[in-house]
């Protein structure tokens, strides 16, 4: 594990309790400029430095990753002054922690079958994050969950979905919110399985 002092004030206060969140499924939703993308990039970088975790970050369309998620992670690394700890592949954006070999890998869901051949250089994908999850299909999410099989059972695996508010007919609402009896005035929900 790499020791880098990142003050809690670096994070949006609302997300601080989720830095250590190990719930199996995690949902971050809010309007644009709510800070969810910045926080998730920060958390991905922290998890990479700690070692033992590889992150697969997806969006529906691969070419939209470069200007959004890849750039956000690069900004975090630069802002924290830790560029010397990472190698960033100029072709696909893959971020590798040079001290431990763990990676953040990026993939589009344009062709979900291609996901079957994506593997990190070391270990397995412990964390799968779907950015702008409202653009994805239920089947794509299920396929990504399958990518998290294997590796040590002691390492918690997480599936993180982030998106802007949705209508009640959307599959994300019917799959994750409706079964909970979600109220429109709720802002959080926490169980070991879902938060």
Show where each model-derived region lies:
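Phosphate/NTP-binding elements of NTP-utilizing enzymes
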Residues: 1-195
């Amino acid at each position: 594990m790499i020791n880098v002092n990142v003050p809690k004030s670096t994070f949006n206060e609302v997300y601080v309790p989720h830095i250590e969140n190990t719930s199996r499924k995690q949902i971050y939703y809010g309007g644009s400029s709510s800070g969810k993308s910045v926080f998730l990039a920060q958390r991905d970088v922290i998890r990479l430095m700690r070692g033992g975790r590889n992150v697969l970050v997806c969006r529906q369309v691969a070419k939209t990753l470069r200007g959004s998620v890849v750039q956000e992670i690069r900004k975090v690394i630069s802002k924290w002054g830790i560029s010397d700890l990472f190698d960033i592949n100029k072709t696909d954006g893959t971020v590798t922690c040079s001290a431990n070999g763990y990676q953040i890998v990026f993939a589009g869901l344009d062709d979900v079958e291609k996901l079957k051949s994506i593997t990190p250089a070391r270990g397995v994908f412990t964390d799968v994050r779907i950015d702008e999850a409202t653009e994805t299909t239920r089947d794509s999410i299920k396929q990504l969950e399958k990518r998290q099989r294997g590796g040590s059972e002691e390492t918690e695996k997480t599936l993180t979905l982030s998106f802007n508010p949705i209508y009640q007919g959307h599959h994300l609402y019917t799959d994750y919110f409706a079964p909970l009896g979600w109220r429109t005035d709720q802002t959080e929900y926490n169980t070991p399985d879902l938060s």
